[in-house]
């Protein structure tokens, strides 16, 4: 079975690969134990009254669009976003990051663009870039790989695990800026198959195609930290690779998305051009919702009033007993992350 078919990554095969790897991880220290679980958005390390969150992620094949357009500055923002948005899902405040760049050759202009992007992302997320590694590996990398790792800190009694999610809770969606940084294997195939020039206007847009595709990933850290001081958040999910399946990583319940956010034009056009159905779209892309928060019904007005002028948001659904994600408007059912 191929890992990629028609531009769509085989999530089941990917899950089997990850599971095979995780099963070998049998050793652990007796102190500084992992108090989270492997498979969450971030890992948690016991530090007494506090826990350190630690996770890593990358920008994926979005870098190939950047290379074709010779525009690399937004990739740094993307890399910061992919990491800090994962860290915040447990209530952890991201504090520091290291980057990893694997390149074919050394180009000072690309380095400046990337560094500028990382700096902008760090300012938005309020973290420090404290180190990194640049590997020149032309035999391995034909393009460029941009990734990083973030640590954060949270008081142990304030860790958000999703355990308190119950039937009747409210699901709030925070709007995305566009594609963010996942699904680009599919995106690139659609762009190629339809012979779309990156420097022409994207269908239905006044922006160039490369500008639409490279729109940087939205960072939600400051908004979530601010609202955490006011409202009890029960669970959070970063909608990245795997689309809305990420919602199931909070707790095994049924998440009914009965009023989804309106997908931006980029998703509508990619769906048409790629001849994809709604199920495929929602298990690949964020479809306009970059981050999901679960709260109690009584807290929804305070939540919305706190953030309504800072990020697009709306109540998109509710929690029921059961399993998976249901999007009745499009007759979509999603079961499990892998």
Swiss-Prot record:
Pfam assignment, any one: AIRS
Pathway: Purine metabolism; IMP biosynthesis via de novo pathway; 5-amino-1-(5-phospho-D-ribosyl)imidazole from N(2)-formyl-N(1)-(5-phospho-D-ribosyl)glycinamide: step 2/2
Major subcellular site: cytoplasm
Localization (cell): Cytoplasm
Record's keyword terms, sorted: ATP-binding, Cytoplasm, Ligase, Nucleotide-binding, Purine biosynthesis
GO molecular function, one term: ATP binding
Biological source species: Thermoplasma volcanium (strain ATCC 51530 / DSM 4299 / JCM 9571 / NBRC 15438 / GSS1)
Claim: Protein transport is one of the keywords in the record: no
Protein's name according to its UniProt entry: Phosphoribosylformylglycinamidine cyclo-ligase
GO biological process: 'de novo' IMP biosynthetic process; adenine biosynthetic process
GO cellular component labels: cytosol
Signal peptide boundaries: none
């Amino acid at each position: 079975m191929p890992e990629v078919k028609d531009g769509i990554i085989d999530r089941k095969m990917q899950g089997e690969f990850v599971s095979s790897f995780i099963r070998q991880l049998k050793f652990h220290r007796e102190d500084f134990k992992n108090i989270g679980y492997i498979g969450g958005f971030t890992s948690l390390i016991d530090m007494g009254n506090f826990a350190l969150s630690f996770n890593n992620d990358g920008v994926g094949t979005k870098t190939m669009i950047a290379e074709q357009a010779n525009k690399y500055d937004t990739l740094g923002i993307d890399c910061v976003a992919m990491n800090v948005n994962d860290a915040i899902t447990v209530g952890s405040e991201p504090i520091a990051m290291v980057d990893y760049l694997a390149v074919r050759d050394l180009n000072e202009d690309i380095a400046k663009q990337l560094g500028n992007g990382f700096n902008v992302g760090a300012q938005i997320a309020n973290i420090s870039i404290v180190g990194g590694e640049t590997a020149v590996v032309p035999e391995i990398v034909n393009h460029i790989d941009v990734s990083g790792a973030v640590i954060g800190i949270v008081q142990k009694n304030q860790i958000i695990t999703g355990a308190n999610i119950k039937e009747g809770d409210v699901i709030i969606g925070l709007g995305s800026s566009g594609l963010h940084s996942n699904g680009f294997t599919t995106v690139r195939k659609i762009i190629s198959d339809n012979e779309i020039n990156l420097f022409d206007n994207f269908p239905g847009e006044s922006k160039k195609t490369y500008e639409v595709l490279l729109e940087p990933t939205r960072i939600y850290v400051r908004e979530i930290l601010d609202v955490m001081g006011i409202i009890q958040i029960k669970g959070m999910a970063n909608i990245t690779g795997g689309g809305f399946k990420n919602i199931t990583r909070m707790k095994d319940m049924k998440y009914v998305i009965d009023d989804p956010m309106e997908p931006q034009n980029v998703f509508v056009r990619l769906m048409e051009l790629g001849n994809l159905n709604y199920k495929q779209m929602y298990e690949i892309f964020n479809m306009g919702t970059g981050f999901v928060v679960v709260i109690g019904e009584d807290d929804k007005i305070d939540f919305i009033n706190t953030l309504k002028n800072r990020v697009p948001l709306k109540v998109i659904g509710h929690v029921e007993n059961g399993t998976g994600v249901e999007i009745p408007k499009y007759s979509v059912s999603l079961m499990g992350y892998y």
